[in-house]
Amino acid sequence: MQRVKDVVGELKARGHEAYKLHRTVARPWGAYTTLEEGPGFKIKRIEVKSTGSLSLQLHHRRSEHWVVVNGRARVTRGNDVFELEANQSTYIPIETMHRLENAGADPLVLIEVQCGDYLGEDDIVRFDDKYGRARAADTAT
C-alpha cells in the first residue's frame, strides 16, 4: 500500500494528471467520489453508511449544494436540523456550521456541488466528530 502512495505522490509531483484517476476516497462514514472539477467548482458523489455521520464542520472558502439521490439525510445547518429524502436539496453557505448524517437504514447517496475560490480538502474546521478525527485542517469531508 505504501508503494501505491509513493507512486501517486511521484505522479503528482511531476505534474501528471493520472494521479487524479483514483477519485474514490474511503472514510469512516462511507466514501466519496469526485465526479468532475474545474476552476471554482467540484462535484462529488457521497455515500454515507447506515448510522454514518460526517463531522460537524465549516469551510472558510467554499459553499456546498447537496441533492439527495437515495436514502434519508439528517442535515444540521447552523442552528437548524432537518431531514431530506430523494429529490430534495439544501444549500450550505460559506462559514456555516453543518453536518450530514444518514437518518435511515439504507445507504444515503447524494450529489454535492462545491463552489468557491479554494476547494482543497484541508479547508475544514471540525467541531465534533464521532470518529475522533482532528478538529481543524484535517483531510476529509
Can you say where each PLM-predicted feature lies in the sequence?
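A short hydrophobic beta-strand segment most commonly corresponding to one strand
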Residues: 1-6, 105-126
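Asparagine-centered strand-capping/turn motif at beta-strand->loop junctions
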Residues: 100-104
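A structural signal for the main folded, soluble domain(s) of proteins
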Residues: 35-36, 72, 91, 99
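Glycine- and acidic-residue-biased ligand/ion/polar-headgroup-sensing regions
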Residues: 59-79
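Histidine-centered active-site/metal-ligand motif
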Residues: 57-60, 98
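Short acidic-glycine-tyrosine-enriched beta hairpin
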Residues: 78-97
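A short, N-terminal "cap"/entry segment at the start of jelly-roll beta-barrel domains
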Residues: 1-45, 49-55, 124-141
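Structural motif
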Residues: 53, 65, 72-74, 97, ...
